[in-house]
A protein has these predicted regions:
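N-terminal presequence-like segments and the immediate start of the first folded domain
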Residues: 1-58, 62-75, 81-127
Length: 127
């Protein structure tokens, strides 16, 4: 059985798209890709990849906490970057949030992200 996770502490699905912030199933939490949208105004926060990564991780944390999990329970993330030139800046912030046992991770350069975002992160965590 699956449980849909929703929280107002993170952005609602982008432009009303048909997806959930997260799904809890089989002892795991599957979090939809998050960009640096602020939940209260729905606009991208930050001009640098560091600022945007900070907001993305804030959004991920809020969703994971709503599911009874947290960043310390991450097992896999996928990072989408507008440019791999931003890899060091993203890593600088990411490292501060994932502790000394970071999750498995893939990082991919993409042609475009929603609303001109520089970074998007999706995640799987233990429930």
């Amino acid at each position: 059985m699956k449980e849909v996770i929703r929280t107002e502490a993170a952005p609602a699905p982008f432009q009303g798209a048909p997806y959930s912030q997260a799904i809890k199933a089989a002892g795991l939490v599957f979090v939809a890709g998050q960009v640096s949208l602020k939940p209260d105004h729905g606009e991208i926060v930050g001009d640098t990849v560091q600022e945007q990564t900070e907001q993305v991780l804030t959004n991920l944390r809020a969703i994971l906490e709503a599911a009874g999990s947290g960043l310390d329970r991450l097992v896999k993330t996928t990072v989408f970057l507008q440019s791999l030139d931003d890899f060091p800046g993203m890593n600088e912030v990411y490292r501060q949030h994932v502790g000394d046992q970071p999750p498995a991770r893939s990082t991919v350069e993409v042609a475009k992200l929603p609303s001109g975002a520089l970074v998007e992160i999706e995640a799987i965590a233990l429930a």
